[in-house]
Amino acid sequence: MANLRKTHPLLKIANDALVDLPTPSNISAWWNFGSLLGLCLISQILTGLFLAMHYTSDISTAFSSVAHICRDVNYGWLIRNLHANGASFFFICLYLHIARGLYYGSYLYKETWNIGVVLFLLVMMTAFVGYVLPWGQMSFWGATVITNLLSAVPYVGNSLVQWIWGGFSVDNATLTRFFAFHFLFPFVVAGATMIHLLFLHETGSSNPVGLNSDADKVPFHPYFSYKDLLGFIIMLTALTMLALFYPNLLGDPDNFTPANPMVTPPHIKPEWYFLFAYAILRSIPNKLGGVLALLSSILVLMVVPILHTSKQRGLTFRPASQLLFWILVADMLVLTWIGGMPVEHPYIIIGQVASVLYFSLFLVLNPLVGWLENKVMNW
C-alpha cells in the first residue's frame, strides 16, 4: 500500500514541499533564511494573537493597555518583548535572504523574485502600522510623517491623506484602522508566501556555484530539515537573549512617552530596519522627489533580473561584481546610520552621496561590470 503522505491530497502537497522535495546537495547556510522567515512569521502571528487579546485600539486606552500587558498579564512582558524584537529578527532575516538572492543570482527566477519583492513591501507595511499601535510619541509622529508623504501625490494627495487618517489628523479612526490592518496583513503575507513557494518549487532552488543541479539532488528530509532546525535553534536562542536581556536595545526611548500631538520629538525616526529608506527619502530636498526615491529604493529590486548582463549566474567566480556587492552592503549600513542622524552638516551630504551610490550600483555599475566581465572572459 502506498504511503499516506504520498497519496492524501493535503499531505501530498506538504510532502512535495517539505519531505521528498529534490534539493541541490550543495546549498549552504545562506539558503536557511527562507525557512527562518517562515518561523519568524509564525512566531509573530502567535505572539501578536496573544497581544491582541489584551490590547485596545482606542487612543484613550491604547498606551495603558500595552502597559497593562507588560505589568498584569501572565508573561505579557515576555510576549510583547518577543513580538517587538521578533520584528527586528524578521527584517534581519529578510535583508540576509535578499542579499543571498542578489549574490547568487536567485533573482533570475523572476516570478519567485517578484513575489518576494511584493512580500517585502507587505512586511514593511505590516511593521509600519504595527509600530503605531502602542501609541507612544514616536508611534504618533512616525504615523503623521509617513502618512503625510501621500500628500505629495499630485491632485489627489490631500484627499488621500485625509482618507487614510479618517479625519483631519492622525486620531482615533487612524489607530483603529491601523490595528485592523496590522491584524490582517500577516495572513496576507502567509498567503503570498505560499505563492512564493509555489513558484520556487516550479524551478527548484539555485545553488552556490550557479550551475544546473539536476544531476546532484538529495531529499529535503532529513538533510535540510535538520539543517533548518539548527538555524531555528540559533535564531530562537538569539531572539530569546535579546528579548530577555536587552529588550529595549533596538527601540526608541520616545515611545515610552504617551502620544502628544502638542509636543514634537526632537528627532523623528522610524525603527532601525527602515532607516536606510528614510535616509534616501530625506536626501532629496523635494517632497514628491523624496517619496519617489523612497519607493524606488525598494522597487529597484524588481529591475535587477532585467539588468542582469553576465553570462554567469552568481558572483561566486566574479571578483569585480563581488566588490560591488560588498560596496552595496557597506552603503546600506552607511544609509542606516545616516537615517538615524539629525538633518545637518555633514550628514546631509553623506546621505546624498550614499543615496546616489545606492541607485548607481543597481542601475549602472552592476550591469556594466557584468558586461565587462563577459568581455574579459572572451578575451
Swiss-Prot record:
The chain crosses the membrane at residues 33-53, 77-98, 113-133, 178-198, 226-246, 288-308, 320-340, 347-367. It is a multi-pass membrane protein. GO terms for cellular component: mitochondrial inner membrane; respiratory chain complex III. Pfam families: Cytochrom_B_C, Cytochrome_B. GO terms for molecular function: metal ion binding; ubiquinol-cytochrome-c reductase activity. Belongs to the cytochrome b family. Heme 1 (or BL or b562) is low-potential and absorbs at about 562 nm, and heme 2 (or BH or b566) is high-potential and absorbs at about 566 nm. This is Cytochrome b. It comes from Anguilla dieffenbachii (New Zealand longfin eel).
